[in-house]
C-alpha cells in the first residue's frame, strides 16, 4: 500500500514533534495539546485540503506555546501500573471507557472510512467532498490523483481511476461556470460566500463521479474501549487496507494509552476475538450462498432510489404512556389505562404539552419518544449513504457496494453539459469493478465504483433518533440525495403514526431558490466579519 509522506523543514519538524506521535506515517495521535485545540483542529479538518500536521503549522502553531522539554506525552508509568492492577486484575471494562485519545487517519479510502466509522461510541470528523476539490495531485511520492493504490489491483485499475479523476477534473470548471450563470450573486450575498457556495454546488453535483477509492482524512476521538473494538474489527477485516490501518492505529495508541489496548496483542484475548469476528463473517457468507441469496436477481435491480418502511413497533398510546412515565408515581399499567380513556382531542393536546415548544430542532422531547421504533430499507447512492451512516444512535446495516442497483446522472449535470461524460465515467467504473471481481477480488472491487452507484442498507431506529436524523438531513442546505431520503422517511412515519410526524416541526420541505449552501456561507461570512 502506497501513501504520501509529507516533507517538513527541520524547523517545522521541531515544532510538530511535541504534539504528534510521528511525522512520517498516515496514522498518528495528538499529544501535549489542550482538549479544545484538539477539537478545533478536527473541526477545521473537514474543510481543509491538506493534512492535519500542515493545518497545525499554518493555523494553530503560532498561537500555542512550545511544551517544556521532557514533557510526558504518554500515560506515565504509575498510571500504567494502576490501570493494570484494576483492569487486568479485576476485569473492569468500564475503566477503559474513561480515558480517550485523538487519532488522525490520513489517506484512507472511502471504503475504509465506513469501516472506521462503524463503532457507535466514538466521534468522527471526515474531510468533506463538499468543500474539497479532488482535481489536484497528491504529494510525490506517490503523486497523481487522490485514490487508493495497491499493486495487487493491477495497472488496469490505475488507468481506470486516472480516467475517472480526469473526467471529474475536466467537468469541475464547466459545472462551476454553469452554476455561476444559473445562480448569479444577489446584492445581499458577499462575494466570498457566493464563490464558496458555487464551488460547493459543483462539488455536490460531481461527487458521484468520484470512486470509492478516493482518499480522505479523518479525525477520531474515542475512549480506549472503543479503540480496542475498532482495532480488532480492522484486523479481522478482509481488506488489506483495513488491516494495515488497524496495525498503525494500534502502534500510535500504544504511545498514548497503551494499557487500554494491552489485550489486543494477546493471542488468548485479542487474537481469539479477531478470529471470532472472521469466523462470524465467513459463516454469514456461507449461509447466504447455501440459501441462494448471494447473487442479485432480476427483481433486485437496477432500481430507482427508494425508502421502504419494513415494519414499525408500538402505538401512539405507548408513546404517551412512556412520555408520562418518569413524572408519575404509579405503574405503567395504570398510566396506560388513564391514557386509553382519553378522547382524540385530549390525547393530541396532552402530546403537544409533553413535547413542549420546540423553537429549535435541537430541542427534542424526552426518552419517552424512544418507545416507538421503525425499520427502513433504503436504496440510495453511496454518497447519501456515507452521510446517513454517520448517525450513531441507531442500527445500520449495509450490503456490499456493487453496480447491480444502478446509478443516475443528476439533472443539473445534464444541464451543465456534462451528462455524457458522467455516463462514461459510470461505465468505466462498472467495467473495472467487473474485471476485479472476475479476478476473485470481489471485496476490493468496490474501490473502482463511483459514489453515484446505489447501495442497499437498513436503518433501524426509535422515534427520537428518527426526529434528529430527519430534521437534520431534510435541511435545504443539505445534499439533495439524503434530503429525499429524509423527506420520505418522514412521510412514511406520518402515515403510521401521524402524531409522531406532527412532532417533527423542523422538517424542511422548502427548496432553496438560490444555492443550497449560500445561507450557511453567508452566516459563516457574518461570523468571521464580526470576529475580525
What spans do the regions from the language model cover?
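A conserved ligand/cofactor-binding region detector
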Residues: 1-532
Amino acid at each position: 500500500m502506497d501513501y504520501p509522506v509529507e516533507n517538513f523543514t527541520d524547523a517545522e519538524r521541531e515544532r510538530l514533534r511535541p504534539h504528534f506521535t510521528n511525522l512520517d506515517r498516515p496514522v498518528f495521535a495528538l499529544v501535549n495539546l489542550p482538549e479544545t485545540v484538539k477539537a478545533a483542529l478536527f473541526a477545521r479538518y473537514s474543510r481543509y485540503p491538506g493534512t492535519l500536521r500542515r493545518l497545525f503549522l499554518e493555523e494553530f502553531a503560532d498561537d500555542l506555546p512550545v511544551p517544556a522539554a521532557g514533557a510526558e506525552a504518554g500515560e506515565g508509568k504509575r498510571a500504567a501500573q494502576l490501570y493494570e492492577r484494576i483492569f487486568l486484575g479485576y476485569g473492569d471494562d468500564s475503566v477503559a471507557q474513561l480515558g480517550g485519545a485523538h487519532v488522525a487517519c490520513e489517506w484512507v479510502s472511502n471504503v475504509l472510512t465506513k469501516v472506521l466509522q462503524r463503532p457507535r461510541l466514538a466521534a468522527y470528523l471526515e474531510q468533506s467532498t463538499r468543500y474539497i476539490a479532488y482535481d489536484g495531485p497528491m504529494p510525490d511520492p506517490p503523486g497523481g490523483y487522490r485514490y487508493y493504490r495497491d499493486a495487487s489491483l493491477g495497472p488496469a485499475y490505475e488507468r481506470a481511476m486516472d480516467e475517472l479523476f480526469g473526467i471529474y477534473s475536466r467537468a469541475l470548471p464547466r459545472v462551476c461556470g454553469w452554476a455561476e450563470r444559473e445562480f448569479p450573486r444577489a446584492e445581499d450575498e458577499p462575494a466570498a460566500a457566493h464563490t464558496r457556495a458555487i464551488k460547493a454546488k459543483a462539488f455536490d453535483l460531481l461527487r458521484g463521479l468520484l470512486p470509492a477509492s478516493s482518499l480522505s482524512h479523518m479525525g477520531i476521538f474515542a475512549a480506549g474501549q472503543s479503540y480496542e473494538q475498532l482495532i480488532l474489527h480492522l484486523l479481522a477485516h478482509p481488506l488489506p487496507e483495513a488491516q494495515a490501518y488497524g496495525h498503525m492505529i494500534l502502534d500510535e495508541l500504544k504511545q498514548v494509552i497503551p494499557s487500554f489496548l494491552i489485550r489486543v496483542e494477546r493471542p488468548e484475548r485479542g487474537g481469539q476475538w479477531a478470529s471470532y469476528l472472521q469466523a462470524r463473517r465467513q459463516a454469514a457468507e456461507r449461509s447466504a450462498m447455501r440459501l441462494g441469496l448471494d447473487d442479485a436477481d432480476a427483481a433486485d435491480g437496477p432500481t430507482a432510489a427508494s425508502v421502504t418502511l419494513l415494519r414499525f413497533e408500538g402505538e401512539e398510546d405507548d408513546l404517551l404512556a412512556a412520555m408520562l412515565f418518569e413524572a408519575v408515581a404509579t405503574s405503567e399499567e395504570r398510566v396506560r389505562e388513564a391514557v386509553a380513556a382519553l378522547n382524540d382531542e385530549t390525547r393530541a393536546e396532552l402530546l403537544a404539552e409533553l413535547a413542549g415548544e420546540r423553537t429549535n430542532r435541537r430541542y427534542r422531547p424526552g426518552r419517552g419518544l424512544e418507545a416507538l421504533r421503525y425499520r427502513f430499507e433504503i436504496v440510495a447512492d453511496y454518497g447519501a449513504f456515507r452521510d446517513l451512516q454517520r448517525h450513531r444512535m441507531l442500527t445500520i446495516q449495509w450490503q456490499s457496494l456493487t453496480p447491480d442497483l444502478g446509478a443516475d446522472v443528476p439533472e443539473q449535470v445534464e444541464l451543465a453539459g456534462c451528462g455524457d461524460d458522467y455516463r462514461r465515467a459510470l461505465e468505466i467504473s462498472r467495467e473495472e469493478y467487473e474485471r476485479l471481481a472476475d479476478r476473485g477480488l470481489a471485496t476490493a472491487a468496490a474501490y473502482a465504483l463511483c459514489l453515484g452507484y446505489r447501495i442497499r442498507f437498513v436503518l433501524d431506529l426509535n422515534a427520537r433518533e428518527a426526529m434528529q436524523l430527519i430534521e437534520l438531513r431534510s435541511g435545504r442546505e443539505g445534499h439533495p440525495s439524503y434530503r429525499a431520503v429524509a423527506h420520505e422517511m418522514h412521510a412514511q412515519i406520518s402515515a403510521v403514526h401521524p402524531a409522531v410526524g406532527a412532532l417533527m416541526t423542523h422538517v424542511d420541505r422548502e427548496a432553496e431558490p438560490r444555492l443550497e449552501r449560500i445561507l450557511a456561507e453567508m452566516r459563516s461570512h457574518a461570523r468571521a466579519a464580526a470576529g475580525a
